[in-house]
Amino acid sequence: MLKKSFQHFKLISTHKVYVFKNCFKARLFWRGIKHDLSKYSPTEFFESVKYFTGTDSPINVCKKANGWSKAWMHHKGRNSHHYEYWVDNFDNGGTPLLMPYKDALEMVCDYIAAGQAYQKKEFTYASEYKWWQSKDKNKIAMHPDTYKFVDIMLKTMSVEENNDCLRPIRAKHYYKISTVKPVIKVVKKKEE
């Protein structure tokens, strides 16, 4: 148990360093510092140690074993960079809400960092995009515009094989084109 505690602590701390580096490039300094601090809380830490494998998220392992995870319920309710945080109207099946720019961008930084932490030297931006494509967009409770933003960002990183699109000028542009609805202007003909 002590060995798994150390291994889990090392993995989440490594992940946190990668998130910080990605957030630094995205100019989300404070978010990089405070990212996922709840993972060190007893509620999240001890369950994650119990289900730690080193190759898969302990939360996913716990969900497979039990159908749910107390650590995940705790985590997603305290960290707005998770799309699950942005679901409301549960009495009617749940309505995914559009994630604000900074939360959506931190989520992208988080996804990349998870790949970097788990895949280590085998990590590529292409493998991360392949992971993203394996998610069925019709089955995840993510707002369609947030989904488009994440898809554009991860696809761009995959093509360019770097994370330069995290820089604010590009990331804000991709967010804008993902979330702005086209304006249809109706022009009335002049009566003669």
What is the meaning of each model-derived region?
Residues M1-E192:
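Metal-dependent phosphohydrolase cores
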